[in-house]
Amino acid sequence: MIIVESNLDVADNSGARRVQCIKVLGGSKRRTASVGDVIVVSIKDAIPRGKVKKGDVHQAVVVRTAYPVRRADGSVIRFDRNAAVLINKQMEPIGTRIFGPVTRELRARKFMKIISLAPEVL
């Protein structure tokens, strides 16, 4: 469960390392984001010569959360840390590689490019 000011790891090679949520998209009263939701983030830590730099504002899709995600079959999946993948205005990832597992919930949200780049889908 991601709220405003939550810090997330970046699970791609766009050049960002850490981001901070500054807005949860999807309605004026929406307060929390879960796996598959799009958020607006500010880059807090980035590597030199990356595609993004510190202070940039981008959209990102949440791919892993520490808060448990309950599925229709009753199973629950959670991760050690929160992570996101930076995306552009066309909802395609900025990076060319995805690090770590992603969840099946992204398929229902039509993030097929992220699913295909991920090494493991849980």
From Swiss-Prot:
Q: Which InterPro entries match?
A: Ribosomal_uL14, Ribosomal_uL14_bac-type, Ribosomal_uL14_CS, Ribosomal_uL14_sf
Query: Has UniProt tagged this entry with the keyword Cell wall biogenesis/degradation?
Result: no
**One GO term (biological process):** translation
**PROSITE patterns in alphabetical order:** RIBOSOMAL_L14 (PS00049)
Q: Name one Pfam family in it.
A: Ribosomal_L14
Q: Which domain of life is it from?
A: Bacteria
Keyword annotations for this protein, in alphabetical order, are:
Ribonucleoprotein, Ribosomal protein, RNA-binding, rRNA-binding
> What GO CC annotations are associated with the protein?
cytosolic large ribosomal subunit
Record GO terms (molecular function)? large ribosomal subunit rRNA binding; structural constituent of ribosome
**According to its UniProt record, which protein family does this protein belong to?**
Belongs to the universal ribosomal protein uL14 family.
Q: What does this protein do?
A: Binds to 23S rRNA. Forms part of two intersubunit bridges in the 70S ribosome.
Fill in the subunit field for this protein: Part of the 50S ribosomal subunit. Forms a cluster with proteins L3 and L19. In the 70S ribosome, L14 and L19 interact and together make contacts with the 16S rRNA in bridges B5 and B8.
Q: Which NCBIfam families match?
A: rplN_bact (TIGR01067)
HAMAP family in UniProt: Ribosomal_uL14
Q: What is this protein called?
A: Large ribosomal subunit protein uL14
- Native source species: Acidiphilium cryptum (strain JF-5)
